[in-house]
């Protein structure tokens, strides 16, 4: 039995390895749905809940990034997680991992909505008063 040259064996290993990686990449690309496709397949109730909670998730992500920046800027060791309680530490067990208080967030959104409604009503009132003050009588000259 003749033995193949060393470069041939390494070339075969490279080709087989490349084909395995390329096959996996192509399968991943064409079989995994995008976020939009996945959301479109949800039932209407789940999709509505997903849309309702989108802002809260974005707020949590912003809060997490803020904490990560603070932690990175500090001189503490990397395993100290800042304000986030680690489940591996004794005082961090049995704590709620949520970064944003949902009730407080909804209350703030409601307050902002009420303020915008009041501002809009005041603007409409000013416009109406302005129209009334500009209104001319039948016999007035100007």
UniProtKB/Swiss-Prot annotation:
Chain positions covered by the region annotation Disordered: 79-99
Tell me which domain of life the UniProt entry assigns to the organism this sequence originates from: Eukaryota
Regions of compositional bias (Basic and acidic residues) in chain numbering = 86-99
Any Pfam family the entry gives: CBP4
A Gene Ontology biological process noted in the UniProt record is: mitochondrial respiratory chain complex III assembly
Sorted keywords for this record are: Chaperone, Coiled coil, Membrane, Mitochondrion, Mitochondrion inner membrane, Transmembrane, Transmembrane helix
Q: How does it sit in the membrane?
A: Single-pass membrane protein
Per the database entry, which stretches of residues form a coiled coil?
Answer: 108-137
Where mainly found?
Answer: mitochondrion
Task: List locations, semicolon-separated.
Answer: Mitochondrion inner membrane
The reply to whether Transmembrane helix figures as a keyword in the UniProt entry is yes
Signal peptide as annotated in the record: none
Instruction: Please name the InterPro entries in this protein's record.
Output: Cbp4
Q: Which GO terms describe its cellular component?
A: mitochondrial inner membrane
User: Mind telling me which residue stretches traverse the membrane in this protein?
Assistant: 10-32
Tell me which PANTHER family the record gives.
ASSEMBLY FACTOR CBP4
What job does the chain carry out?
Essential for the assembly of ubiquinol-cytochrome c reductase. It has a direct effect on the correct occurrence of the Rieske protein, core 4, core 5 and apocytochrome b.
The entry's family comment says: Belongs to the CBP4 family.
Q: What is this protein called?
A: Assembly factor CBP4
Protein's organism: Debaryomyces hansenii (strain ATCC 36239 / CBS 767 / BCRC 21394 / JCM 1990 / NBRC 0083 / IGC 2968) (Yeast)
